[in-house]
Amino acid sequence: NSVFILNKIGFDKLNESEKYYPFKLDFYSISCNKICDLDLTPFNSANDKYTTLKRSTLTKFLKEKLLSDSIIFNKKINEVKQKNGKIDIHFVDGSSDKVDYLMVSDGVFSNSKSIIEKKFFKQNYYGAIAIRTQINNLDILNLNINNISIIMGSNAHLVLYPINQKKELNLVCIVRKKLEENN
């Protein structure tokens, strides 16, 4: 994950009560029978741990820590090159910029990943909707609220994970709807 980079701008100083460090990733069937788990601790170092938190907490942190002139909005990337330890970004409008780090967060249907990686990525999100909410951990039965839980079904999957030390949970549900053919 990107904690190593975020720590360079002070993420490690963020209030510990606003972060959570899950130990495992648990996989369940749609009927909540546990299939297996993955230990996340081997991916951690002393300073860089697998971390979950509220999206709003991360957004606020980034807005406070990054200079407003270092965030570029509403630009389409045309080309990305690395030269002498810097990243040279060329935009569709003819402008360009040199940066140390490039973070792109423009959605799953963006072509930025294809441009940066210099290969085509086909999106596989047809006929799906995503629902996101936060819930109280008391609402969850039979799941380990200390871990990230993935519940998998044939047309849906749910991901639950703690987002702070109060163990409030994020719930993300992806549902694929089979489209009926018109006769």
PLM features: residue spans?
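Short beta-strand-to-loop capping motifs
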Residues: 133-139, 173-175
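Generic detector of short alpha-helix boundary/capping microenvironments
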Residues: 20, 119, 141-143, 148
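Active-site substrate-recognition segment that forms the wall
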Residues: 146-181
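Conserved N-terminal helical subregion
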Residues: 3-134, 178-183
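Short helix-loop capping/hinge motifs at secondary-structure junctions, enriched
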Residues: 12, 137-144, 166, 180
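Generic structural "secondary-structure junction" signal
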Residues: 37-40, 55, 137, 150-154, ...
